[in-house]
C-alpha cells in the first residue's frame, strides 16, 4: 500500500483498494490530487434540458445544444458521427458483454453493438489532437481552462473535473497521477461542470453524462 511521506494513505490508494475489494460505496465523490472526481461502476449518458443531476459531469462537444461527438445511450445512437467528421475521434464505449474499450473511429456504426459510447479527444497513448481535427480554430479546445475527463481503470469509470489545465496537462495528469487505462477529454471552458455529493461546480449545464 502506498502512503504519503507523513504516513497518510491518500484518496487514490484508498479508492483503488475499495474497488479491488468490491466495496459497496459507489458512486463515490472524492478529490484525487486536488481535482474533483466521481468514481462509479457504470455510466448512463444523458442529454437533458434540466439542471445537472447528482453524480454527473458535463459531457462532450456540442453545437447549438446538440451533441456533435459520437454518443450512444442504451444501445441507441444519439449522434453517429465524430466531431470533425470524416476525421475520427477517440470513443470510450461499453460492449454488450460488459467490457469497456476505446477506439478511434468516425462513426458509431464502426463500433458494432454497444451499450453506451462517448466520443471525445483521445488521451494517454491516443493523445494526438491534430489526428482528431483539433487544429486551427478548433485548437482552442486545448487551451488552459477547466476540462472534464471520462476515463476507465480496473473496472471503474472515472468522471474527473480538471481545474485550469491545458489539454497537455490534463493528459499528463490522467497518465502520471490517476494512471487511467483509457480516457477521453470532454468539452471545457464555461461548460465544464460536476455535480456530486460534495463537488458542485457549474451545475446549471445541460449537456452531460451521468
Question: Whereabouts are the PLM-identified features?
Answer:
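Zymogen propeptides
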Residues: 1-85, 101, 159-160
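Active-site-adjacent helix-turn-beta-strand microarchitecture at beta-sheet edges
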Residues: 3-4, 60-137
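Short, flexible beta-strand-to-coil junctions
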Residues: 42-44, 61, 94-97, 153-155, ...
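Polar/charged alpha-helical tracts
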Residues: 15-20, 31, 49-51, 74-76, ...
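A broad, low-specificity signal marking well-ordered, structured residues that form hydrophobic/aromatic
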Residues: 54-55, 90, 100, 121, ...
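Short beta-strand scaffold segments in enzyme catalytic cores
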Residues: 1-2, 26-31, 38, 90-94, ...
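Short, well-ordered strand-loop elements centered on a beta-strand within folded domains, enriched
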Residues: 1, 34-39, 97-106, 155-162, ...
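Conserved, well-ordered active-site substructure
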Residues: 65-86, 135-210
